[in-house]
Amino acid sequence: GASEHQTGLGLDVYVKNFAGEGFVKSPAGQFVNSESWKYGFIIRYPSYGKSSTGIKFEPWHIRYVGKPHAAIIYNDRLTLEKYIDSFETGEWYSAEGYLISRQEIGESVTMPKAFGSAVISPDNTGCYMITVRNRKSAKRKQGGFLCCVE
């Protein structure tokens, strides 16, 4: 199958006597909901996201997206869907000390000059998310979480 659980990207966290939405009332649930982004995880179906995910709040369902992506999603209160949609395909953005691009899946991808290593992952919408540690200090766009890199 291709569900988040089957791919290994998503997992459910369980605490005895704190099932379902009650998970956030447990110490572990409070930690997961406030700190998991620091480790590259997001709450896949946040309380504010039903209109974009189609799924009600599931505080126990987390997904690994990587540290820079999780930081942006958490700090800007985005769903994964809204985050992916915020990228103009083919453009490079600077955030959280990284350069990030969403590019069409094809025979080649465009990479920035002078990069050390990159993480290239499919985004499940027909594109790749490319993440490169930023070696230059790029300016952040005022009033937005990302800026285009020229």
Q: Residues of each region from the PLM?
A:
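A short pocket-lining beta-strand/turn micro-motif at the edge of beta-sheets
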Residues: 39-41, 58-60, 69, 126-128
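Short, flexible loop/turn elements at secondary-structure junctions
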Residues: 15-17, 66, 134
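Short, surface-exposed glycine/acidic/tryptophan-bearing loops
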Residues: 1-10
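Low-complexity, Gly/Ser/Thr/Pro-rich intrinsically disordered linker/tail segments
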Residues: 68-141, 145-150
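Long, well-ordered alpha-helical scaffolding segments within enzyme catalytic domains
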Residues: 20-43, 47
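Structural recognition of the beta-strand scaffold that forms the well-ordered cores
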Residues: 10-15, 42-45, 63
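Acidic helix/loop microenvironments that form the catalytic cleft of cell-wall polysaccharide enzymes
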Residues: 47-68
